[in-house]
Amino acid sequence: MATVLQHPPFFYLSASPYNLYPFLKRFRDQHFPTGTMILRNASWQNLGGLITSLQQNTQEYKVSRIEKIHSWFPRRQFVCIGDSTQSDPESYGECARKFPGWIKAIYINKVTDIAEMDVKNRNSDERFEKAFKGLDRSLWHVYTDAGELRERVDRLSRQG
C-alpha cells in the first residue's frame, strides 16, 4: 500500500494505552509500513494522563487526535482505514464532515470474529449510514476481505 500511494506518511491511531507500545510496534513492524503510533496516555505512571484517558470516550479521543494530525497537514489528503469494533466509523465520519475534502477515502473493515463484540449492531448498515450521514457515498466503503481493500487503494492511487 505504501508503494501504491507513493510513500505517504502513516499514522496508527489507537485507543490502546501507551503501555502496549512495545507489542504494537513489533506487530506494526512485521505487517505494516513504518509510521507514527498515537496511543492513549493511560498509565499509572502518569496520573493526569490516566484520568484524562478515563474521562474521554474512544470517539472523542480519536477525533481529537485526528484534529491534531489535520493541524500538522491541513493541505494533504488522508485515507482513513479502520474497523467496526469500536468507533472508527463515527470518528472518521465526524472528521470528514468537519474537514471537507481533507479525507480522500474511508475504509472500514467489518469485523465478524470477535465473540465479545455485538456483531449485529456493530456491523449493521444502519450504523454505517448514521456514522457517514451527509457524506458522499463514494467517500466511504465497508469491506470484509483485505484483497478488496487493496483493490480500492490501487484504484484510488490511479485516480490521483
PLM regions: where:
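Glycine- and small hydrophobic-enriched segments that form the cores of compact globular domains
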Residues: 1-17, 22
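C-terminal cap/substrate-recognition subdomain and adjoining C-terminal extension
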Residues: 16-160
